[in-house]
């Protein structure tokens, strides 16, 4: 996503109508503090590059953002609610959203997507999310291809630790929320 010419050559060959932009820097969230330049390059500048290519070739762009762009205090957020990213990861995704918003043939998905099965050995107690597995999200995409604007997509609101215990393949150990700086308390 950093090389516009390479992306242009790819879409010319493939004759793409829709592009799902899932690329970028995501985990662990602390990497966005340590390597914030990479976060800027991939999640903001890289996303702007994707917008340029989609615009040039009139490709529908579907951008995977995060529900962490909301204040993450009370949950149950609507697309029209105020934004206040809680950490550098969320700020970088909101930066990507800014360029996508300029391109009207686009859809921004604000979601909390995770791998199936839950692969981590630790999960947060006292933090809530509306996680959906990537395979669940993939089943929704065909139904929203023609949507535009911003859509929040999420599953049932659950404590992250309980979600991990129910759907994880490993024994899950709890992490206390107060031990981690700027982790979203309720992004549902």
Regions found by a protein language model. Name each.
Residues 3-42:
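NAD(P)H-binding glycine-rich loop region in Rossmannoid oxidoreductase-like domains
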Residues 19-23, 61-67, 109-111:
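SDR active-site strand-loop-helix element
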Residues 40-47, 62, 92-93:
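Short alpha-helix in the Rossmann-fold core of NAD(P)-dependent oxidoreductases
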Residues 48-84:
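Conserved Rossmann-fold NAD(P)-dependent oxidoreductase catalytic core, especially the SDR/UDP-sugar
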Residues 84-112:
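Active-site Tyr-X1-5-Lys
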Residues 111-118, 128-158:
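Alpha-helical substrate-binding/gating segment
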Residues 140-183:
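Mid/C-terminal beta-alpha module of Rossmann-like enzyme folds, strongest
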